[in-house]
């Protein structure tokens, strides 16, 4: 069994604030403004609870073999920003981007073997917003992989 996860969004003890859903949500919560570069780029997403459930599902069902894409929401960056804006209440600023890359995945193969995702990108945004309001989620440097690794390597 090979699982090819899409971009994982939602809360984890070791947060990733450099992936689209989490990044845009943190911008809205921290600054009250979301900066979108381009916006037409599409990213596939899967909630962290669903990818965890999928791993458990596959362990419990070893008869399902092969390669499985795991991503259930192919959403443009602009649509993610709009959803964050509606949930959190932040302004969206669009700037040009020279990176038009888009990624999409089809996970019908997983649906056909009986796996059903339970959570959405909107759920992740709401959960992150609630944790931020409780003080349990902070915009920490080590949650931005490239910045953190660069600082760690060159300091």
Report the location of each language-model feature.
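Residue-level signal for the nucleotide or nucleotide-sugar donor/cofactor binding architecture
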Residues: 15, 19, 43-49, 72-75, ...
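Conserved C-terminal active-site "lid" loop/helix of NAD(P)H-dependent oxidoreductases
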Residues: 48, 78-79, 98-117, 123-127, ...
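Amphipathic terminal alpha-helices
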Residues: 121-155
């Amino acid at each position: 069994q090979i699982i090819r996860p899409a971009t994982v969004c939602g809360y984890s003890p070791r947060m990733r604030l450099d992936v689209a859903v989490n990044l845009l949500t943190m911008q809205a919560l921290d600054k009250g403004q979301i900066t979108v570069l381009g916006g037409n780029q599409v990213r596939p997403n899967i909630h962290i609870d669903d990818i965890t459930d999928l791993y458990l599902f596959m362990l419990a069902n070893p008869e399902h073999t092969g390669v499985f894409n795991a991503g259930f929401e192919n959403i443009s960056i602009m649509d993610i920003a709009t959803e964050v804006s509606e949930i959190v209440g932040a302004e969206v600023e669009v700037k040009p981007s020279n990176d038009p890359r888009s990624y999409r995945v089809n996970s019908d193969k997983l649906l056909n073997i009986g796996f059903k995702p339970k959570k959405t990108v909107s759920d992740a945004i709401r959960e992150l917003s609630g944790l931020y309001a409780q003080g349990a989620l902070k915009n920490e440097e080590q949650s931005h992989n490239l910045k953190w690794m660069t600082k760690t390597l060159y300091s």
